[in-house]
């Protein structure tokens, strides 16, 4: 069974780390929406101070056919992004007619700022605050508290997905 996963949340909440771990566990294709935006020069068009809905929909238009090829071959796809426009999520779901699971990651702003300050490419407090404000305007899908250890958050997400079972060591196996 083929499906895709959307991991959304504020800057610094651990989206990429979590999405990459989920993708590795599922042997899925990992897609970083920010990378698509950067590679196709889609970050300049602004709407209310944020990257525009139009830019995100263009990113969806670019990546959806590639994702569909993986999905048609039975390979799951994991999307990682802020997804701060609901229209962007709806557009991606409309473009990819496959089973899907959406997760909104939650962490307090101070946790996001602290995590951002510890990475190689720091975005800064102002960017973290701005993205946090926009992303937290709505929840979509299952809400996951990511203030817990990484493995606990991974486990919570995997419990929602098909074809997974625990082995005796409480690790997931694909079936």
What residue spans do the PLM features occupy?
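Hydrophobic anchor at the beta1->P-loop junction of P-loop NTPases
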Residues: 7
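P-loop (Walker A) phosphate-binding loop of NTP-binding proteins
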Residues: 10
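ATP-binding Walker
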Residues: 13
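Walker A/P-loop
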Residues: 16
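Conserved substrate/cofactor phosphate-moiety recognition/catalytic segment
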Residues: 20-68
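Glycine-rich phosphate-binding loop used to anchor ATP phosphates in small-molecule kinases
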Residues: 54-97, 101
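Conserved phosphate-donor/acceptor-positioning beta-strand/loop module used by diverse small-molecule
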Residues: 96-115
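Small-molecule kinase domains that catalyze NTP-dependent phosphoryl transfer to phosphate-bearing small molecules
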Residues: 118-158, 163-175
């Amino acid at each position: 069974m083929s499906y895709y996963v959307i991991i959304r949340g504020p800057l610094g909440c651990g989206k990429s780390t979590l999405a990459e771990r989920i993708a590795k566990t599922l042997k899925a294709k990992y897609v970083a929406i920010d990378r698509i935006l950067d590679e196709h020069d889609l970050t300049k068009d602004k709407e209310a101070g944020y990257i525009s809905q139009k830019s995100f929909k263009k990113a969806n238009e670019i990546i959806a056919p590639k994702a569909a090829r993986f999905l048609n071959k039975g390979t799951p796809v994991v999307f990682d992004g802020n997804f701060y426009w609901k229209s962007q999520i709806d557009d991606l779901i409309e473009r990819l007619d496959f089973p899907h699971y959406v997760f909104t990651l939650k962490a307090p702003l101070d946790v996001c700022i602290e995590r951002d300050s510890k990475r190689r490419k720091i975005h800064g407090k102002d960017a973290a605050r701005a993205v946090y404000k926009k992303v937290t305007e709505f929840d979509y899908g299952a809400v996951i508290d990511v203030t817990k250890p990484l493995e606990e958050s991974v486990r919570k997400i995997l419990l929602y997905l098909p074809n997974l079972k625990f082995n005796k060591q409480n690790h997931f196996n694909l079936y």
